[in-house]
Amino acid sequence: MPNLKGFFLLLCTTIAFTSTAFAAHHSSDDGESALSPIEKAAEYPLLLRRTTLIVRDIEASLALYEAALGMEIIYDEQIARPHASEDREQRLRLIFLRASHDHVGVIGLIDYEYGYPEHPAHSKPIRQEGFTPGNPILLFNTQELNTRWPTIAATPGVKVVKAPGLRTYPGYDGGPDIKVMVSIFYDPDGYLIELNQIVTE
């Protein structure tokens, strides 16, 4: 039986390579700097700009994504609106974090019941179902895996699935093998994350 997990990880690595090249190409364009974020995004006919995670405790999420992974907050707003089904105001908090590019690989964090700590949404059971249908995987490439890993593993709510270890994948079009240090863990809400480092030597 084919190693489907290995194939999926290889596919994720391929996507990560592509995203890295895209980011390097577009971030070097000096003409971009005069454009607003909305104007920059409008330049592309189709752009997977952001993945937004619905979270239980946005501060716990920030402890991982900002403090441990090193992402940068580029948007942080509280939004008040009438609740759709209850006679009260709903207050949500929405945060965007960037990695190394303003328009590729942005993570959104949203708490739909921010300021209501007793709301049932905050105590919803956490699913940790691994590599199964319906469960996304967030894949990060880093050049600082060994440096960041101890902080990540010690972050409250994080569950380690696999500590960093070397994996080798077939190269492109018969080229040299691709060596990757792979780590896998769950974030505080049960989202599965890979933090990988491509071995270049």
Give the predicted meaning of each segment:
Residues 1-6:
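Positively charged n-region of N-terminal signal peptides that target proteins for export
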Residues 7-18:
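Bacterial N-terminal signal peptides
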Residues 21-23:
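Boundary at the C-terminal end of the N-terminal hydrophobic targeting segment
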Residues 25-51:
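N-terminal low-complexity, Pro/Thr/Ser-rich intrinsically disordered segments
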Residues 43, 53-104, 200:
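Core segments of cupin and vicinal oxygen chelate
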Residues 56-59, 103, 112-189:
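Vicinal oxygen chelate
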Residues 74-76, 163, 195:
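Residue-level detector of high-confidence beta-strand sites
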